[in-house]
């Protein structure tokens, strides 16, 4: 793992101008809301450190690099409230940065000023996309230097996953599969007046019991007509026995996300009408996955998905004219996946090592049916690999889970 992190840093620093300093900030916990701390993903990508109020600093001069990390001093009083902070030994083991270059925040400003002056630095790189007050203060304080945004450079690197990153995504998907099976078990209990939030809680509890400390995003558990709202936020409705239940869910492992959607019959059997629509979406899901290989674009996949869905809906008399598909399909078929659920990207063709989703859907309000089927796909040298193929999506396989 540490070697992977070192390799990422080396690739990043190759793209930075000489006579430059890079400053990345991990972010700060908000004490007013007491929300969980969410580490800056670019900081984590290059350090493997998730601790708040930490700085990662790189110096590049004459094509030689120095790396520093600044952390909070360990404080026995604060430790009683919030637990132990990382020590320099911990940081060295996790990040691979030399022990002598692991410093404390009380000397951060002094050290930065020394590095700038001693090395006649001309450029400062900051992650300006993540609009932290701390970064804005640094930008203002050192405005006499050339300021560059390193967000796009890191984004381009993050798009290509190394083996360690891919394994993290696979672990997250495997845990999500366990959560999906828990959803089925919960539905099999056949309790009257079951609420969407009961399924929501069952999934979240299951994945937290299986080695992940993170839910990748707020689970979308939507029954009946609620499945027609893409980011349905309020899972409080009663689930009716003849409904379909759309479950857009994902765990994260070591901050790497999975993103899976399955649409299942509450009573264990698809009706004929539900089957008709489900089979169109499933065929589209499989068709788009077949097309994936290096050299194509996500925009191409979207065009093909929309064309396929409109043609199928015409043939099945769901619409009368092709343009009417916009009423029933109104989102993109794919996005990048990684440290963020909707991961960073620059407009480019697909390359080996990228991970994307494939998630066609149809949302027919008048029939109270919303169906989406989403898989996570790794781009390989010769094509693709579906990382979520173990999660049932064929009608017969889903119905078999209820037996």
Predicted feature residues:
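Active-site neighborhoods and metal-handling regions in enzymes and metal-associated proteins
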Residues: 1-403
């Amino acid at each position: 793992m540490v070697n992977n992190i070192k390799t990422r840093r080396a690739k990043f620093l190759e793209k930075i101008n000489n006579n430059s300093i890079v400053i990345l900030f991990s972010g700060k916990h908000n004490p007013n809301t007491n929300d969980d701390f969410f580490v800056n993903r670019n900081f984590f990508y290059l350090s493997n450190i998730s601790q708040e109020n930490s700085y990662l600093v790189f110096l590049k001069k004459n094509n030689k690099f120095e790396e520093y990390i600044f952390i909070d001093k360990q404080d026995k009083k604060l430790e009683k409230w919030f637990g132990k902070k990382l020590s320099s030994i911990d940081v060295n083991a996790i990040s691979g940065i030399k022990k002598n270059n692991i410093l404390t925040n009380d000397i951060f400003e002094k050290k930065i000023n020394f590095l700038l002056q001693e090395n006649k630095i001309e450029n400062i790189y900051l992650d300006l996309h993540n609009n932290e007050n701390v970064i804005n203060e640094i930008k203002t304080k050192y405005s006499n230097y050339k300021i560059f945004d390193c967000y796009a450079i890191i984004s381009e690197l993050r798009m290509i996953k190394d083996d360690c990153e891919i394994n993290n995504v696979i672990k997250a998907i495997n845990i999500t599969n366990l959560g999906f099976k828990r959803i089925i078990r919960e539905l099999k209990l056949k309790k009257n007046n079951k609420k969407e939030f009961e399924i929501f809680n069952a999934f979240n509890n299951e994945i937290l019991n299986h080695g992940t400390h993170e839910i990748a995003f707020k689970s979308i558990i939507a029954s009946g007509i609620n499945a027609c709202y893409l980011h349905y936020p309020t899972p409080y409705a009663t689930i009716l026995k003849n409904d379909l239940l759309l479950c857009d869910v994902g765990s994260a492992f070591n901050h790497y996300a999975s993103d899976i959607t399955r649409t299942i019959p509450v009573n264990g059997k698809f009706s004929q009408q539900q089957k008709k629509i489900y089979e169109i979406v499933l065929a589209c899901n499989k068709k788009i996955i077949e097309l994936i290989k290096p050299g194509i674009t996500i925009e191409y996949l979207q065009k093909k998905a929309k064309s396929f869905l409109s043609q199928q809906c015409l043939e099945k008399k769901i619409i009368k004219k092709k343009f009417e598909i916009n009423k029933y399909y109104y989102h993109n078929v794919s996005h990048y996946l990684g440290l963020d659920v909707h991961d960073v990207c620059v407009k480019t063709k697909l390359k080996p090592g990228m991970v994307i989703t494939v998630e066609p859907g149809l949302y027919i309000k008048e029939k109270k049916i919303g169906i989406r089927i989403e898989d996570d796909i790794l781009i390989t040298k010769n094509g693709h690999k579906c990382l979520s193929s173990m999660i049932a999506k064929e009608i017969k396989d889903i119905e078999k889970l209820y037996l």
